[in-house]
Amino acid sequence: MNLGRVGEELAVRFLKERGHDILEQNFRFAHGEIDIISFYKGVLIFTEVKTRRSDRYGRPMEAVDSFKRRQIYTTAEYFLSTQSIRYHSTRFDVIEVFIGEQSMIHYIKNAFNGNDLEA
C-alpha cells in the first residue's frame, strides 16, 4: 500500500472515530478527485488528505494550492449536482497525515472555501 493510501485510511478512521458518516472515498470526476466526502452534524464535508513522512519540504497543506482547491471545488459542485438530497451547509477541510515513528494527524477545518479560488 502506498503512502497516500495509508494516509487516507488513517484519515477515514480518524473521522469515523469522531462521528463522521463516510459517504464517499476517492470520488472522481473529469476535473478532479475528492479524497473523502463525509457528513457530520448537518454539514457535508469535502476533505483533502495530504500525507508526508516529514515536514522537511513544507507542510502538506501547502500542496493544496489554488489549482488543487479549484479542482476540489469543481468536483464538489459536480457531486452536489448528482445528489437528490439538498445539503444546506458544506465545508472544505484538509487532513495532514505524518507517517513516521509516531504517526500524527493534523485536522484543518474550513481550510478553504469558494471565495479562496483565484481566477
What are these regions (language model features)?
Residues 1-25:
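Acidic-basic catalytic patches of nuclease active cores, encompassing PD-(D/E)XK
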Residues 15, 36-53, 64, 72:
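Conserved catalytic cores of phosphodiester-cleaving nucleases, focusing on short active-site segments
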Residues 19-23, 30, 43, 88:
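The start of beta-strands in P-loop NTPase/AAA+ ATPase cores
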Residues 26, 37, 50-52, 95-98, ...:
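Anionic group-transfer/hydrolysis microenvironments
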Residues 29-32, 101:
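Short acidic/glycine-enriched loop/turn segments that link adjacent beta-strands
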Residues 55-59:
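A short acidic, helix-capping loop that chelates divalent metal ions and anchors anionic groups
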Residues 60-88:
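Mid-chain, well-packed structural core segment of small domains
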Residues 82-119:
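Domain-level recognition of nuclease-like catalytic cores that cleave nucleotide substrates
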